[in-house]
Amino acid sequence: MPKLIIVTGGVMSGVGKGVVVASIGRILRARGLSVNAVKIDPYINVDAGTMNPYAHGEVFVTYDGGETDLDLGHYERFLDVELSKRNNITSGQIYLTVIEKERRGEYLGQTVQLIPHVTDEIKRRIVEASGGYDVTLVEIGGTVGDYEQLPFLEAARQLGLELGEDVVFIHVAWVPLLKITGEFKTKPLQHSVAELRRYGIQPDAVVVRSEKPIDANSIKKIALFAHVPQWAIFNSYDVDTIYRVPLILEQQGLGDFLTRRLRLPSRSPEYRDWEEFLSKLSAPKYRISVGMCGKYVELPDAYLSIVEALKHAGAALDARPELVWINSVEVEKNPDILRKLDLDAIVVLPGFGKRGTEGMIECIRHARMEKIPFLGICFGMQLAVVEFARNVLGLKGANSTELDPETPHPVVHLAPEQREVDVLGGSMILGNREVEIVPGTLAASLYGVSVITERHRHRYEVNLSYLPKFTEAGLVVSGWRRDIKRVEIIELPGHPYFIATQFHPEFKSRPAKPRPVFLGLLKAALFAKR
């Protein structure tokens, strides 16, 4: 039988429930258990692929091409696993599947209803995802009381009834600190637990999210009104880095509680590598100023995995990347702002659409001309090709056909397999692809192997008809798609560090396993500083 830890949220969203879930996973992994994690998003979208990054943040791409919630990135980084697209369940997926089954006659003439048909489909997916694992974490997105959560809470209630002692319910809720009196206000949490109990779910444990460590009297009050023992109330307060949360919850006894409650093997947790990473992350010797140029920089969560990948690489080098967010629209208005920033490295970020792209191209030109270590990712690589075509080859008006369909020099164009696609969602080049590294290149020295596997999310590619001109002018293609001829990595010899990738290296970065292109960027920046 599967063992499930079902996590709900109360009071308000966006308080770090996903980090708490990932931390629980890390705690169990430290005991040698195999752990899976599922994120439920109650929105009607089938997946996150078409959602506005300002509203939703980053779209995290799984190895099998799922466009998922950014919490799956937290899960992968904390658990050091690769998750599937089946690990992100949405209302859209559930309703679509139920309707398709009804159209095929699979319900044999029944009146299809929320209960049992929708809830059965939810349960089926959760149980299916839990197969082969010691424990599966299930995070129900949103806040208890949201209308769209109801079928998922009902499915969770039914699973608790059907699986009994093999299900643990944990409720995560924010407790605000009233600064005028210095008092924690537990009433909103009490109400959220009361609301959860209305749906037939009594939490076995509560994780209190708070700005500062919560006091003993507040814990007593929560225990009384939430009907949870004091020893099953834990506190995830604000800390300098999210990677410290597993150790805080471990010290409070959450690991031992879950081991007892789910009758799991009792083993001493092993955190040696995690603690070593934390010590380097928290007290670095060096600082590196990294310019992050993109069009969604007002919401850094739109680039969350890149931010984390830079942290991982920095910790490996005993350095802290200090991120300078550069709005490419502002660069278009005033390119001179780049000179005033005194950057040690520049990353040009992924994106879509025309807005702000000339500012991104200017950032690339600045990095190339001023010999500043540079990394371009996905759209950033395509724009690096455009910049080189315009300013080195002298191809006036060179562009991507995504940005200018009438460009006289389409150095980046729609990939052949995308030209007949007329559906927006789930139709890009997605997921893992193998990339062959060209020997004797910067990419070869970074990766140290001839073939790598990286995750993708794009529609456009470098136009190979311009390749002879690029090669003659000194641009090197150092990585190719293995199954078809497609440019995956470009670089500029003679520059301290200038490399760009069509793939997204950030999605496979882990705290103890930073990705080579991020390591190389920060190494080059450190070398230049010295």
UniProtKB/Swiss-Prot annotation:
UTP binds at residues 13, 185-190, 221. Mg(2+) binds at residues 71, 139. Allosterically activated by GTP, when glutamine is the substrate; GTP has no effect on the reaction when ammonia is the substrate. The allosteric effector GTP functions by stabilizing the protein conformation that binds the tetrahedral intermediate(s) formed during glutamine hydrolysis. Inhibited by the product CTP, via allosteric rather than competitive inhibition. Its EC number is 6.3.4.2. Pathway: Pyrimidine metabolism; CTP biosynthesis via de novo pathway; CTP from UDP: step 2/2. CTPSs have evolved a hybrid strategy for distinguishing between UTP and CTP. The overlapping regions of the product feedback inhibitory and substrate sites recognize a common feature in both compounds, the triphosphate moiety. To differentiate isosteric substrate and product pyrimidine rings, an additional pocket far from the expected kinase/ligase catalytic site, specifically recognizes the cytosine and ribose portions of the product inhibitor. NCBIfam families: PRK05380.1, PyrG. Belongs to the CTP synthase family. This is CTP synthase. It comes from Pyrobaculum aerophilum (strain ATCC 51768 / DSM 7523 / JCM 9630 / CIP 104966 / NBRC 100827 / IM2).
